[in-house]
Amino acid sequence: MPEGHSVHRITRQFARNFVGRTVLLSSPQGRFAAGAEQLTGHVMTDARAVGKQMFLEFDNGLWLRVHLGMYGAWDFAGDIVMDATIAASNGRMGQTNQRGTDLAGTDLAGTDLSGDAVLDSAGENSLHSIGAPRRTRVRMAEQETLRQAQGPTEDTFPPEPVGQVRVRLLTETVSADLRGPTACEVLDPAQVDAVMHRLGPDPQLDDTPEAEQRFVDTVRKKPTRIGMLLMDQSVVSGIGNVYRAELLFRARINPHAPGKSLSDDTLRALWRDWAHLLAIGVNTGQMMTMDDLDETDYRLAMKNRADRHWVYKREGLPCRVCGTHITLEEMGARKLYYCPSCQA
């Protein structure tokens, strides 16, 4: 399931390519035909992410809410203008392990990025230039990959829909196809406010002391295990399985500890670390959770998922700190990774 950093990055692409433009909506699959009819032909005025959900506003006052869930993903095609943080980072755009095309070039400041490529061991390329728009196809979900369009799609725009496309958004130059979401619906402003009110704070949107205090107060009231609370989107927005495991290890917190047993200071530090890791994820496209790496180790970590986490998917392997074997168990029907010694 895409975690919060991915949804923020997708939203930035909508902000760069759709906001301020008239958008045509259709539902090639047919399931969203009525919703598409309500929005088509209107100007997109805002693109906003809250945790794992995205909200796109149109000039008729209606919003499109999308939650990708476990299997949802966006495919972009056309003359795409890459968001600067995506283009200049070691991020990837896509859900599959397709080999990308390295895009050598410059960033917005004119810096040559052609020598900075870091190839992922799964065959995914980094994205290295924003420059002039390129005719590309981009798939954005939990992991990110860029590939140049091949075959007829190089010369044909918009491309023919492929698979079960719930909704297509189309401008004169860019299209975005949504497949497999958990939620795709049209909301009015009151309904959007109601959904957002149910969501916990997201440090990418609100890093104020008030947001931090809201998180602390919510957790301190609950007897629920902290490993469950971090996955509860009404407590804090955007955290998924990877970030849960890594945040708890970095804080040396037992995932079974009741929320109300944790001190204010511990929870404040946890919130601030989440803000720190989320910012890294948004800016790089990677759930990089290891700090203070030298250049060699950093490049290895960007290439290989196994080298960028403390405990996630390291069950049975020795803890990087104490040597105890990492434990895997289920919590809330999701896999939980932790060190039984460091997090005792």
Q: Where in this protein do the model-derived segments appear?
A:
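Structured catalytic/nucleic-acid-binding cores of DNA maintenance enzymes
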Residues: 1-344
